């Protein structure tokens, strides 16, 4: 009678990088009564060099660095007698286990593959299939090594090499994106992807693709009907395409150049175009908008020289009022990334704004924030040192329709000149819904 091996899988997951690997501190335990202890080391991460331009886009993320509760390693085995079989080892936060068993004959050498690929699952019937809603390229596909001896399989990722790259798409947290590619071969695939991807950015605003972009390959990122990024992996920037085991970053955040390409003055036509751009963004769910540039292009309107983007938010409010549309009030989270000064009447009746974040502003003009009725939060990232409040209405009626506006100040604001220090929920003769120091 032929002897059949049914065995439990022993996993030793080692760091796999191009340059080094970490040694395990633990040692394997003796086999007793057919059971084995599973030993797990650090997970091999991609990593992003903090000195590279890519790491400055959005929130850098070196990727997965350790095994987590629920992680799985999949083993497939093909026996001449028992055919194709698959088993999933599951990590519970401290050890690995599987309820499955794999069988082969004593006198045969089975065909075995082991890999970490979260896009796959093992069914109750012992077959491997893509998880619902998953496509190759949406997760890693890292192959491991194995040895079979005396009916025991030992798996290790030591020395494993990624034959693919990672593309980190920097977007807005929890936002769903449509990503289309050309000449992109997903990790774990042997041919290029033909279907678009639907990716949801994580809490850091990042979404990922794993695979190889050939020289000349393209990637397009859209939110609804709005194209956020079109990129080509040109021969100049990426000769021979993306490199194995390397992470790349693509900026697909909804960013507006407040300088309109380096201008200091804007036209009525450019204002109209900006209003339509903002309208398109908002109506396609792009409600976190980043504006770059310190010296923004301005337009003389009603006797005031106002940055064209701020003016466009005012004009958009009037447009929605004329159309009797109020569903977009208080929907936009606006970030003025580089601006250092808010001019007179800059944010005037901007009812579409939910929050305004100003990392670098230190100077505020008279009536700089006036009657933004749905503004929930105003954030100053730097210490405000100058407020030109000739009218006494610099923060007039902010959050009037929603029972007040929250204020966030730099923690060092308490060390500013006396008039610029907050007291309780009062700052600059204005009662705020709350004041938070960060």
Residue ranges of predicted features:
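Sec-dependent N-terminal signal peptides
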Residues: 6-12
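A structural signal for leucine-rich repeat
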Residues: 370, 391-399, 420-422
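Sec-type signal peptide cleavage vicinity
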Residues: 2-6, 20-261, 269-279
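Structural signature of tandem-repeat unit edges
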Residues: 287-304, 322, 326-341, 351-363, ...
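N-terminal segments that cap or nucleate solenoid repeat domains
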Residues: 256-313
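C-terminal capping region of solenoid repeat domains
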Residues: 420-438
